[in-house]
Amino acid sequence: MRSKLLMMAARSLSTPARRPLRGVVFDLDGTLTVPNLDFKVMYERCGVDPKEDILEAIAKMPDAEAATAAAIVEEMEEEGRRTLELTPGAREFAEWLARQGIPTALVTRNTRATIDHLHATLWKGLPPFSPAISRDDTYEPKPHPAALEAILKTWEIADPAEVVMVGDSPANDVVFGKKAGVATALVDSGRRFVEGGSDEGASMVVENIAALAAGFHERFELPKAGPLQKYDVPSPSSDAGKAAVAGDLARLEACADVSLPDASGNTPLIWAADSGAADVIPYLRDRCDVNHRGYLGATAVCRAARKGHLDVLQLLLKADVDVNLPNDKMQSPLHFAAFKQNHACVDALLAAGVSRYVLDRKGRTPAEDTSDEEIRAAILAAR
């Protein structure tokens, strides 16, 4: 069922031999961000026929008229920057690409000011797009391939098929990518039907941008996608760790420093969460880093979610925890709870605002990583 859901989420229209994925280039409006400009109003205010390209039309106007129209465009774009939002799954997909070691670039008809605003706000904490090409640059607009060819040159990529162009417009983004020889991914938000219904031969078509991760994992060789390894199950080696597993508060209070990890990397808080020792969680929660990544990168929240310790999880959620922080295998707390079919933990994490689109190393969301139909339905309904 999980494989069927993945096939529905990411429809691969062609299956060439697996190539390395060396970069992803994005469109902005409708792909990474929710469209928030009323272009009908913009065209009307500028006195431009909707069938024309507004920027080209303004360039042909007399100077005074062009200045007025340009000011209208800037005014509306400034308001657009203030209300800019990412599309669902965009940030999670960007985080997945970053963890896979895949560089990203941007080509948009927005201004440099909009790109700078994006980097400083919604994209904060993520690798910036480099190159990030706006209409302030000198390249021909999409679908002319000049901007994309410049990115390939900057990245020193000889084989364009090792790069993917991601966009929501068949006429602009898909054709743009195909002219440069790169693979193409269409985020099918419905725009293609406005443009005539064709996907213009996109290599992949998805309904949500996060679904591209599974498609990329299947289609390409990823830089950091090594084989899955088996690891030993550790035991606590410190007095504090052993006391935490036993739920012995008196022994913990006698320890010199309960915040330190032991040889496994686990803090006493992680050991307590793993064993379900709820009675000592408040004491350790106040003395340990609640977001510390222990053995294989798992946090206390990860361990509680995996083991189904709802009482422990609820106590941890009262602290300033990162509920989406994954382990080294890119498994998040919601992945663990969903895969292990811990219904109550899934509900608690959803109520805490966990991401419904967080992706594991294979590009699966928690809804795709569970065989429990009820859990899957709950996660999808919460999107």
Each model region followed by its residue ranges:
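Asp-based, Mg2+/Mn2+-dependent phosphohydrolase catalytic module
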Residues: R2-G23, E95, T111-A113, H117-S235
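Ankyrin repeat structural motif
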Residues: D248-C255, A277-R285, H309-L317, N342-L350, ...
